[in-house]
Amino acid sequence: MLTAIIDYESGNLHSAEKAFQRMARETGAGEVVVTSDADLVARADRLVLPGDGAFPACAAELRGHKGLYDAMVEAVEQKGRPFLGICVGMQLMATTGHEYEETPGLGWVAGDVVRITPENAALKVPHMGWNDLVIEAAHPIFDGIAGGDHVYFVHSYHFRVTNPTERLAHVDYGGPVTAVVGRDTMVGLQFHPEKSQAIGLRMIGNFLTWTP
């Protein structure tokens, strides 16, 4: 089994690579590679799309790596490969992003990415630090995870999901902020699992052993 972490020049992937490789060893999930090789992405059994920075910049970088982008889309849309989006990689699953300008996303989960606007003016943006998960729907990504378990966030924009059944978990930050989305063979995490200690590692392991 091969898991490809897609490298499209959007952030340092070292900590994510180490976390995924550790959990692949612990779960017997095979090999994990960081790659910008379209052929390797096409052959991978599951895909991970990270992302740090602004939505339009990440979208442009991803689409700018055309062979890589096409291989990823074909693997997910036509071959049904399990897919995990992390942070901006999760946001790119949306229909549209509204950071600085309107930017089309992948359109895999209907909704848009908008600035966080806490009802409590004392809450600062970006939303940075630990927050407690409110799980809204059962999903294999939550195996061994309980409501109230905390994970680590750093973001100023969040995914406003159109279909409530595709928002799998949220956190409270002056109102609900989407934490996990998913449908079919796709799941996305707004938080950084590689920075979320035991809970994040457990979710990485859950993805690596998920057979949708």
Curated annotation (Swiss-Prot):
It is found in: Cytoplasm. Pathway: Amino-acid biosynthesis; L-histidine biosynthesis; L-histidine from 5-phospho-alpha-D-ribose 1-diphosphate: step 5/9. The active site is at 87 (nucleophile), 192, 194. Residues 2-212 form the Glutamine amidotransferase type-1 domain. It holds the Pfam family GATase. IGPS catalyzes the conversion of PRFAR and glutamine to IGP, AICAR and glutamate. The HisH subunit catalyzes the hydrolysis of glutamine to glutamate and ammonia as part of the synthesis of IGP and AICAR. The resulting ammonia molecule is channeled to the active site of HisF. HAMAP family: HisH (MF_00278). This is Imidazole glycerol phosphate synthase subunit HisH. The gene is hisH.
